[in-house]
Amino acid sequence: MRRLADALIDPIRVRVPADPEVLFEALVASVSAWRGREVHVHRAAFPPHTASGLWLERDTHDDVVVDERAAVWHQIVILCHEVWHMNRRPADEPAPVGRPRPVAARTDFSLAEEQEADKFGMLMGRRLRSWLDTSAGTAHTAEPGDPQDLAGRIGAALNYRGTKR
């Protein structure tokens, strides 16, 4: 789980503290690179008391739908929940030609697969949330290539938010 998180987070290069939309788009680009195909994220309202995310694997790309009413940091958690399902699906299953693969709807929150996906989504949310909450003027705000950039990324991974003034 941590290896996948590292594989998705390591390529992300955004100014920290990050604009939530910029971080979200950078994560989507990283997921697309990891998948080796485009991942299109759509925002839509889900009916109350139902799912907050959905993944459809198409012939040439993936569609992920996240609840538009969720805060962006929560949309990151939802997206990463769906990414975990992408990671766990057997790669050798052929898709019906011209149609999306069958959708596995969550029927039981206690299913081990759903708990793993939730755990991964929360892990990613925790690790990336610190990129949003970092105060300006810390090492996290260094430009890519700046020697402080590495220190900032380490600090972000450890949830370090700088000294209080």
Predicted features, each with a name:
Residues 1-165:
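Active-site hotspot residues in diverse enzymes, especially metal/ion-binding acidic/histidine motifs
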